[in-house]
Each structure stands twice: as structure tokens, then as C-alpha cells.
């Protein structure tokens, strides 16, 4: 087998800020409430900048704070120039940018331009008449009719958050408009050059000129649709509407649009950070890697979802998995990006997924929760790619308690999924209260709600989420906040928070973490995830015990010579285990990183 360094492009190990920085995602409604109204806000974020800087954060990715009706948690934007009143004012964001730059930190904003809100002025104008100048900013199509004369939408596409149509009828102009997400989120028509120029000038340049340092581009691979909008393949004959992504994900002009965006906007602002969200892609490297090849001049990094789907897809239909599956996916992305010269994003959590310590670790006891949270931190911090940490991940925040009822799951995806399934089961069984335990199990394991409850700052009422007053938070605080919070962990050298801080510093001190060529060890081992990273003269061995058992791991010859260890870090106190024998005695959920 050829060694990776013989086939990886030279630019893969070229140093760059966007590769080495630690990016921390802030979900503003749930981060910190400065004014006591129960909703997190921009001033709350400003109040915690020193905490984030001390942790080792270089960049904040700020989820949407724009003016919005909040049908879909702010991703339905009605004004890209205004800040929603619940979060503060434009002056507050200007202050946030200034305070971050003063601390040598950067701000990445969420760019949501596959769709907007139906209350955005563009759409308000668009639906007034068929000859309105903004009509073609969106996808409008005429109705069809069945053989019985029933009005039908233009095609059989299904929207993402329900089993219903991706088309909504508009009475005023007697046509349908396309919405891949909620009906309140009409899709923008990127085929229209006037729309594209408005995005570049009125949104992107407007924010970059205010000091924004880059964009996380929401579902950016959906902006190009096959213009004829053909019917989707029928995957489920029992469903009236079908998954549309064959004709709207990674569409025929998506690379053309992103190249144009780079030429018109991104190339004119040096040192920007760009990352594109690329769902519904079936993990095809030939499709995904071109987005991030430097010579293509599109994006720096992407978010891929294969690792996130190892425990089940669709998201709310969980399944068990073997460690070897998790290792194979992680390793394939490490190696393929190296071979092809692309760049990874490393993450286990964001606002759309459940908590990593509950999914990939073990939160059944405090001891296991601490150990596995540290183990996952060690893994992420030693993989090649741009590292993302989600708020609360650094203190091992866990999934919502299993005794919480469906009413506490307030995300639109959770509520719609539960309501639709309940209606189907009522109709089928005739029972007023059919068994929904399997649906609740899916929500308890993987709902987006788990990432969205308030950040746990201390053990005061509501976890110190509100800096003033005792207003009820917009979402219920986790029951365990008195035991799991920043204040309790920040002074404890053995805490998860302290380990994250040490691990982030370790990553910055050892470039093999970020740039090292990757070799998986023992791929079939269902208990230990081990790999080697190599960068210039530095060689790093990572050994992760993913079980609650003590065991002996035999180091394969690819682990290399371990007789001269120059540095190490692990999630247990005490001296480094003896490695010269070729075996490592591992404690439950032990993580061990050694540098030679």
C-alpha cells in the first residue's frame, strides 16, 4: 500500500489560519441572556468573550440573529440587515465584532440564502403579481390537474420537515411556490442573475463591510435546481410526495454559482473563513471534494454528514452501530481529503444534532460521562481538518432527560414528526392514544432539541442563563445543571472543561494534529480506535478505548518506535503507561495521545 505522503497534494499541509483555528458555534437564543427576558442575546455573547478566549477559541460561528418570524429558529430571515429584537440591535452586533477583533478573534455569520422568510420584502413583492420585478427571485410554477380534475402541485417533491408537498398554493396569483423546508421559507431562484447579485451586494458585501470575517453557508449545495424540476424518483410507493434531492442537491450550476460568488465577493476580502453545509449528498467524494479544492476557488471547507448518520438516517430513526463502522467513516474522510487535497471540518455537535456524549459516549454515570466527553475531545482535537466546538460540548452537556414529555420538544422538526405519526397511528388503530414509544425513543436519542436548551453557566436558578432577573428561559433548562455547569468545572483541573482547554492548547502546539497524514490501526477492533498522525519529523499515536472495560491493546508495528516520547496527554491522571512492551493497558474509556 502506497504511503499517504506519496499521493497527497503538497498544498494539503500548507499552513493557513482557517485550518488551524478553533471555531466555537454559538446558538444565540440559548447561550446567555443579558437582559432577563428569557432569550439569549448579543450582549450576552459579549459578556462571555473572555471565557471563550481563555478556552482557546479563535472564531465564533454565530447562528442567525437576523430579523425573523422564527418559524424555523431564525433560519427564516425576513430582513438580512436588521437584528431581531429578541437578540438586540445592529449596534450590539457592531460592538460584538469590535470586541472580538480587539481580542484577536473572528466572527463567522450564518449565510442563509437557499431560502428566506415569506415575510421578506422580496417575497412580499414577488407574490403581488406575476409581472412583479421580484417574481423570478423565487420558484413559481403553474398548477397541474389529475385525471379527475383535482389541482396538483407542479411535481411530487416532498418538503424536508414533513411528508407534505414542497409546493404551496398562493391564492393571489394562482400559482405554487417552491419551499424545500417550511412553507414559510420560500426557495430563492439562483437561476436569476439579479437575485444572485442582490445576495452578493445586499447581503454578503454588506456584512463583510461591517467587519464580519466569513460565512457558514446554510444548505449551500441546494441553490442549484434542475431547471425543469422533474418528478423525484419514487422511493416509497406509499408516500404521495418523494425525496427531491436527486434534482436539487449539488445541481448542475452549483459550482458555477460558487465560483461566481468567490469572484464577485469572497476574493475581494482577504483572510475570510468559508464553510458550506452540504447535506443529502450520499457521501460521494467525487461530488463533495470539488467544493473545497483550492484550485476551484469555491469554498475552504464543508460540513459532511456521513459520520452523523452512522447511528441512523433519517435522523429521528436511530439504529445501533459498531465501532468499526464509526472508524471506517472517520478514516475514509481523513484519507480521501488527504489524497485529493481537500479539507475537512471536524465536529460531533452543532445546533441540528443531539449531544455527542449521549450519542457516541456514555452518560449513564458521572464517571463515564466525564471520561467519554474527554475521549471524544481527544479524538476530535487530533483529527485533520478545521475544528468546531458547539456550546456546552466543552462541559459535557447531555441529551434532555428521558422523562421529559413531547411538549418539551419544541423544535418544528420534532413537533411535525410526532404529530404526523400520531395522526397516522390514530387513523390506523382507532385508538385515541396509540403507542408512540418508538417515536419518543427516536426523539430522545437524536432530536435537534438536545442541542438547543440553555447553556449551563452555574448552579443558580436556570443555570445562570439570565444575567438579570429570573425570567423563564424560552426553553426548559436541563435538570442536571447544578452538577454540570461552567462555574463548577472552570476551577477543577480534572473537569471536562479543563481537559478541553488543555487539548485545544495541545492541538495548537502539535501541528500533526491538524496537518498530520493519517493511518488507521487495527480497523477491525470493536473496542479500540487507534491511529497515527505524521507531520514532518513529528509522529503521533492516538489510542482511544471506546468501552467501559479495562483491557490490553497490542500495538501493531505501524504504531512505530515509541521508545522516545517527547509529549503526551490523556484523560486519566498519572504516569504514561509503558509502551515499550508493545502492549497498552487501557482503563475504561481511556484516551491516550503520545508524540515521538
Model-derived segments and spans:
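Active-site and adjacent substrate-binding regions of carbohydrate-active enzymes
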Residues: 2-596
